[in-house]
């Protein structure tokens, strides 16, 4: 049976916890996991490739959700060929450096309202390499687009009001406006953001740093010295600013977002524009 083959190839039964006494119950649990995960892996006719849908009954493939689920659905179960197709699917509709965060329920138009989906793609690629070591696939099919995404984030992305760019003062990423929601907190009421997070969001900059380190690693692997130096420089600058600006010593936590505040009077006192929950 297909389910038994997938279980055997995945090696999941070898991960039986030492304190889990009922081996048969664990095997049944693994089978249920395989069956359940299969329901989210679908074939997209428009691309002739597999993709991951975000949920039932009506969600299609959402960039953020699909890429978060990527390792658990495909890599742990060793479905590497399908994993490659999902990565290729994510790349097909990239526009101005943005991976679509979803598709319209009417007509299937790509929606670009996410600052993190493109950055999550880098982590998915990194995990794929950890499981497969197939650097040739990444080099031949994904790397050029990954490089383009980084360049767009640096130079600026205006598509659909995303307002994403690198602040050259601190090498952190700014995203959004007071009218847009392009992080995971994307709820709106009457087109007004419920939790405005425009500015420098903590997870966006953590993912940005991660993406830069992954690009540094790839350039090191392929002996691209100039690229290695460039991405290391950007990552080091980002890390320094992140540690300095995002840590809240009073609450011993990270600030959630650093707002962009424009002072009318340059001599006015600086306002603490950092927010924690």
Give, region by region, the residue ranges found by the protein language model:
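An acidic intrinsically disordered interaction segment
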Residues: 21-42, 80-91, 167-180, 239-244
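Solvent-exposed loop and edge beta-strand segments that line ligand/cofactor-binding
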Residues: 50-66, 105-118, 190-206, 256-277
């Amino acid at each position: 049976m297909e389910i038994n083959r997938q279980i055997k190839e995945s090696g999941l039964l070898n991960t039986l916890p030492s304190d889990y006494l009922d081996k048969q119950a664990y095997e049944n649990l693994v089978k249920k996991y395989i069956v359940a995960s299969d329901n989210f892996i679908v074939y997209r006719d428009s691309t002739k490739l597999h993709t991951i849908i975000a949920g039932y009954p009506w969600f299609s493939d959402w960039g953020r959700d699909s890429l978060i689920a990527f390792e658990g659905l495909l890599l742990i179960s060793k479905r590497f060929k399908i994993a490659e197709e999902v990565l290729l699917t994510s790349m097909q509709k990239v526009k101005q450096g943005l991976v679509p965060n979803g598709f319209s329920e009417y007509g299937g138009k790509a929606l670009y309202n996410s600052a993190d989906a493109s950055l999550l793609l880098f982590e998915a690629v990194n995990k794929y390499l950890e499981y497969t070591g197939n650097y040739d696939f990444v080099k031949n099919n994904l790397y050029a687009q990954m490089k383009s995404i980084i360049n767009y984030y640096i130079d600026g992305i205006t598509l659909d009001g995303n307002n994403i760019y690198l602040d050259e003062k601190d090498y952190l990423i700014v995203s959004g406006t007071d009218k847009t929601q392009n992080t995971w907190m994307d709820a709106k009421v009457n087109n007004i953001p419920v939790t405005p997070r425009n500015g420098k969001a903590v997870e966006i900059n953590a993912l940005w740093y991660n993406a830069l380190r992954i690009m540094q690693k790839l350039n090191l692997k392929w002996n691209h010295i100039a690229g290695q130096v460039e991405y290391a420089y950007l990552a080091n600058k980002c890390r320094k600013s992140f540690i300095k600006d995002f840590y809240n010593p009073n609450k011993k936590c990270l600030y959630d977002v650093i707002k962009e505040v424009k002072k009318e009077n340059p001599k006015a006192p600086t306002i603490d524009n950092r927010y924690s929950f």
